[in-house]
Amino acid sequence: MVTIALGSRNPVKINATKEALDVLKLNWDLIGIEVDSGVDKQPFCDQTYVGARNRALNVIRVTNADIGLGIEGGVCNVYGKFIANAVVYVITKEGLENFAISSSFTLPSSMVSLILQGKELGEASDIIFKTNNSKTKEGAIGLLTNNVINRKMLYVQPIVLALYPIYNTMINNTPF
């Protein structure tokens, strides 16, 4: 049995990983362990990649799982607009590494202002929408889209994409 370890105990990230494994019809054991990302609570731009990779590396070290998976949400200024997205990074114990990026979405100036004052996106969302701990539920994307797209949905596709070299190799003996 293949064991995949997620570098988080956030229920949204765990459920998104479960859904991705279900979509792929992979009967892997999933464990979620909180590990350090090595980046700020609210990473910007390239630090999002660093945080996701660090989570994957750290969780595979702590658990000795077959696959380490890190998910890190971040914010970046692109052409004068702040966008949010997530990076999903996978590492196997054999050293294969891959990553994928979620869809991105622009943030309203009210959120950007709070983020630039030191709040993380989840905190900014909670303040503006008068919610609590939205990062473990629908997330900023869910609040902004009236749950047409929620945080779990945002993560499933990049998890599938980050894992493709691993499950294709296991299923089809495709060399990567």
Swiss-Prot record:
Domain of life: Archaea
A single GO molecular function term of this UniProt record: ITPase activity
Note on how the cofactor is bound: Binds 1 divalent metal cation per subunit; can use either Mg(2+) or Mn(2+).
Residues that, per the record, bind Mg(2+): 36
Top enzyme class: hydrolase
Cofactor: Mg(2+); Mn(2+)
Pfam families: NTPase_I-T
Family annotation (PANTHER family): NON-CANONICAL PURINE NTP PHOSPHATASE_PRRC1 DOMAIN-CONTAINING PROTEIN (PTHR34699:SF2), PTHR34699
Protein name: Probable inosine/xanthosine triphosphatase
Provenance organism: Saccharolobus islandicus (strain M.16.27) (Sulfolobus islandicus)
